[in-house]
């Protein structure tokens, strides 16, 4: 009896890593392959393709400091995780292991290489992440969402393929919804999100910006905002005082459909968010996460801003006054919103899951006729 080949998908436990892994998993299952997820404990809070019986948790640790103690802790956790991952490889015997970034992918990818199992890494950012960079010279193939990510690494170009970011079925469904240009006096739907982990800066800045918009826009505004539990009371109080039509929650499971129904999205610029905005084609105001060593979110936001699909505001400039000015200008110019939506869609790639699945099957030597 022939056993159906298994592909292990390794991803850090946040939406930006997990959602592309889920999208690839769906495509591989369509091709009659089995898939499992290898991740860290954070991923267990997400519902989706990977049920608990399809998920293996491997000990891992993100680098959180440069002190000897912090580095020693990280090293110990990664070593422990690699031992666990080696046992996993022996038990599961996967045909290939695919990494989607984040330090939790290091143990399974290292274990796969030690066992001679084919490996692929996918990076969704405009600047390759640190974990993937550590793995890049040791894997069989590299997939990137954007062209030119490794132009300064000539030794890696030969094994690099630009696939785009695999999109979940819900995003693909949302991408079929055309942008509904708002009327000059009709509802203006604004969605504020901070990534899968939320962003306190949105709770600090957005309510003050909304207050500065004034009564005519307050009456038009239909606001949906992701707000952490600890910030909920103070944010809600502002909107209730202004009588804003606002829906607040720590997390929206139906985010793809909310993206599709929005006129303006205010968000961080994680790779997954930028890819989804391109796939669906919606105008956005993007605030890159500051302080990152490689400034990946700044570069990600540039992908949309450079084609006119987004407004990029660095966090030091992200004030209530600045946001209110941008929102007022967009609300007064429906034609500009429509143009931004069309521009954003030009960077979307809807066939990325198929392209990445083709690469995986090639590396795993599963693409030959039976």
Swiss-Prot record:
Keywords: Cell cycle, Cell division, Cell inner membrane, Cell membrane, Cell shape, Cell wall biogenesis/degradation, Glycosyltransferase, Membrane, Peptidoglycan synthesis, Transferase. InterPro entries: GlcNAc_MurG, Glyco_trans_28_C, GlycoTrans_28_N. GO terms for biological process: carbohydrate metabolic process; cell division; cell wall organization; lipid glycosylation; peptidoglycan biosynthetic process; regulation of cell shape. UDP-N-acetyl-alpha-D-glucosamine binds at residues 14-16, 125, 168, 196, 297. The keyword Cell cycle applies. It is a peripheral membrane protein. It comes from the Bacteria. It is found in: Cell inner membrane. GO terms for cellular component: plasma membrane. GO terms for molecular function: UDP-N-acetyl-D-glucosamine:N-acetylmuramoyl-L-alanyl-D-glutamyl-meso-2,6-diaminopimelyl-D-alanyl-D-alanine-diphosphoundecaprenol 4-beta-N-acetylglucosaminlytransferase activity; undecaprenyldiphospho-muramoylpentapeptide beta-N-acetylglucosaminyltransferase activity. Its EC number is 2.4.1.227. It catalyses: di-trans,octa-cis-undecaprenyl diphospho-N-acetyl-alpha-D-muramoyl-L-alanyl-D-glutamyl-meso-2,6-diaminopimeloyl-D-alanyl-D-alanine + UDP-N-acetyl-alpha-D-glucosamine = di-trans,octa-cis-undecaprenyl diphospho-[N-acetyl-alpha-D-glucosaminyl-(1->4)]-N-acetyl-alpha-D-muramoyl-L-alanyl-D-glutamyl-meso-2,6-diaminopimeloyl-D-alanyl-D-alanine + UDP + H(+). Its main location: membrane. PANTHER family: GLYCOSYLTRANSFERASE, UDP-N-ACETYLGLUCOSAMINE--N-ACETYLMURAMYL-(PENTAPEPTIDE) PYROPHOSPHORYL-UNDECAPRENOL N-ACETYLGLUCOSAMINE TRANSFERASE 1. Cell wall formation. Catalyzes the transfer of a GlcNAc subunit on undecaprenyl-pyrophosphoryl-MurNAc-pentapeptide (lipid intermediate I) to form undecaprenyl-pyrophosphoryl-MurNAc-(pentapeptide)GlcNAc (lipid intermediate II). Belongs to the glycosyltransferase 28 family. MurG subfamily. This is UDP-N-acetylglucosamine--N-acetylmuramyl-(pentapeptide) pyrophosphoryl-undecaprenol N-acetylglucosamine transferase. It comes from Nitrobacter hamburgensis (strain DSM 10229 / NCIMB 13809 / X14).
């Amino acid at each position: 009896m022939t056993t159906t080949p298994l592909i292990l998908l390794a991803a850090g436990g946040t939406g930006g890593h997990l959602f592309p892994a889920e999208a690839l998993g769906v495509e591989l299952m369509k091709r009659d392959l089995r898939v499992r997820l290898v991740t860290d404990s954070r991923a267990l809070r997400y519902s989706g393709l990977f049920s608990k019986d399809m998920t293996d948790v491997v000990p891992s640790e993100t680098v959180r400091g440069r002190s000897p103690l912090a580095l020693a802790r990280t090293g110990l956790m990664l070593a422990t995780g690699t031992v666990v991952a080696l046992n996993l490889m022996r038990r599961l015997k996967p045909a290939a292991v695919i990494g989607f970034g984040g330090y939790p992918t290091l143990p399974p990818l290292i274990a796969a290489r030690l066992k001679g199992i084919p490996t692929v890494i996918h990076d969704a950012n405009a600047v390759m992440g640190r974990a993937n960079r550590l793995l890049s010279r040791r894997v069989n193939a590299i997939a990137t969402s954007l062209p030119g990510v490794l132009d300064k690494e000539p030794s890696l170009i030969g094994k690099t393929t630009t696939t785009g970011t695999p999109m979940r079925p819900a995003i693909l469904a949302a991408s079929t919804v055309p942008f509904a240009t708002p009327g000059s006096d009709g509802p203006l739907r604004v969605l504020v999100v901070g990534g899968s982990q939320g962003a306190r800066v949105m709770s600090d800045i957005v309510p003050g910006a909304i207050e500065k918009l004034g009564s005519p826009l307050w009456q038009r505004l239909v606001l949906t905002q992701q707000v952490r539990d600890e910030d909920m009371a103070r944010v809600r109080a502002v909107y209730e005082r202004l009588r804003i039509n606002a829906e607040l929650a720590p997390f929206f499971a139906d985010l793809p459909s909310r993206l599709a129904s929005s006129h303006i999205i205010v968000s961080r610029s994680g790779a997954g968010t930028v890819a989804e905005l391109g796939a669906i084609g919606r105008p956005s105001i993007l605030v890159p996460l500051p302080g990152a060593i490689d400034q990946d979110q700044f570069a990600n936001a540039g992908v949309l801003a450079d084609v006119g699909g987004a407004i990029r505001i660095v966090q030091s400039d992200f004030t209530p006054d600045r946001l209110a000015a941008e929102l007022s200008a967009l609300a007064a110019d429906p034609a500009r919103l429509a143009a931004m939506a069309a521009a954003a869609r030009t960077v979307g790639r809807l066939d990325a899951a198929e392209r990445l699945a083709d690469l995986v099957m090639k590396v795993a030597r599963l693409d030959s006729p039976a």
